[in-house]
Amino acid sequence: VTPDNDMLILDCYHGRLQVPEQEKMIDLYWNKWDCSFQAIEDKQSGIGIIQKKKNEGRPILELKAKGDKIERATASILFYANMKVYHLKGAEWLGNLETQLLEFPNGKHDDVVDTVSYAGMVIENKNSIVSGV
């Protein structure tokens, strides 16, 4: 997030991982990007990972799915409409990200869109979220 609240998408992973690999990926991104917090959806495998990372002292924002996927995407749709989202030019994952975004909500896959949707919600509510972490 820039000081002007623009969304920067600097990295993107898409794939199915078992829980141990999910934790490794979460740790990898934590260390790679020197995050102030991490956001994890609080359902399925995320519940246990949230508990473990919190017990390790990591600041975790628990994401709760509310409404349908289109409703959750509203904040990010507005970021895109206002040209406040930037993708890393030339990134190997960029084609997959853009395909999922362009096919949403009727595409075969929308996992990456879900992540972008949550990012938009987090940025939109940044002040209240950061103080609550």
Q: Model features per residue range: what roles?
A:
Residues 2-104:
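Mg2+-dependent endonuclease catalytic cores in nucleic-acid-processing enzymes, primarily RNase H-like
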Residues 88-92, 112-117, 131-132:
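Short coil/turn segments at secondary-structure boundaries
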Residues 100, 105-123:
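Charged alpha-helix within mobile-element recombinases
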Residues 32-35, 85, 110, 125-129:
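Intrinsically disordered or highly flexible coil/loop and linker segments, enriched in small
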Residues 119-133:
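Acidic two-metal-ion nuclease catalytic site recognized across multiple nuclease folds
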Residues 1-2, 115:
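Gly/Thr-rich phosphate-binding beta-strand-loop-beta motif of the actin/hexokinase/Hsp70
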Residues 14, 45, 113-117, 128:
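Low-complexity, compositionally biased segments
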